[in-house]
């Protein structure tokens, strides 16, 4: 128990999970979301600045594997450029987006209270189309945001 938790008392400790949980509805389902710590959010944002280059390279190789025979490509500085667009930068952006989606989905709480810390982007992609993935991230971001205003009907 933390110093603050001790000061707030036993009742707080019993209800701590509820205090740190918010909900939103989508498609008739109520999703529970763990409000992340500042450190968890900072770790995600820091990853954007410095993603795993091996993962970016894997994404790049998948993007360009069939492009060598396409007309109009330019090979330049260890990159393939199509219509002035760097495939390496595209791969980086794709990887960062998938990372963000996965990390935000991990804030969801399973129906029986289990964490989703073990999921991968492949798990997310097999369950939800990209449009739903982006909607989930948007909804999660709304409820964990400091500007979030909880509305309860009494």
Q: Could you say what each language-model-derived stretch is?
A:
Residues 2-17:
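Extended acidic low-complexity intrinsically disordered regions
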Residues 20-28:
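Short acidic-hydrophobic surface loop/beta-edge motif
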Residues 29, 34-154:
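Short, surface-exposed, charged amphipathic helix/loop patches that serve as local interaction elements
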């Amino acid at each position: 128990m933390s110093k603050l938790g001790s000061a707030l008392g036993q009742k707080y400790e019993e209800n701590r999970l509820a205090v740190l949980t918010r909900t939103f509805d989508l498609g008739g389902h109520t999703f529970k979301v763990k409000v992340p710590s500042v450190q968890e959010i900072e770790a995600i944002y820091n990853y954007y600045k410095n993603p795993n280059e091996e993962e970016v390279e894997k994404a790049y190789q998948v993007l360009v594997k069939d492009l060598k025979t396409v007309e109009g490509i330019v090979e330049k500085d260890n990159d393939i450029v199509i219509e002035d667009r760097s495939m390496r930068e595209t791969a980086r952006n794709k990887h960062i987006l998938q990372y963000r989606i996965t990390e935000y989905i991990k804030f969801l709480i399973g129906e029986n209270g289990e964490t989703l810390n073990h999921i991968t982007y492949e798990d997310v992609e097999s369950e939800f189309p990209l449009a739903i993935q982006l909607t989930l991230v948007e909804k999660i971001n709304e409820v964990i945001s400091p500007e979030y205003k909880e509305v309860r009907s009494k």
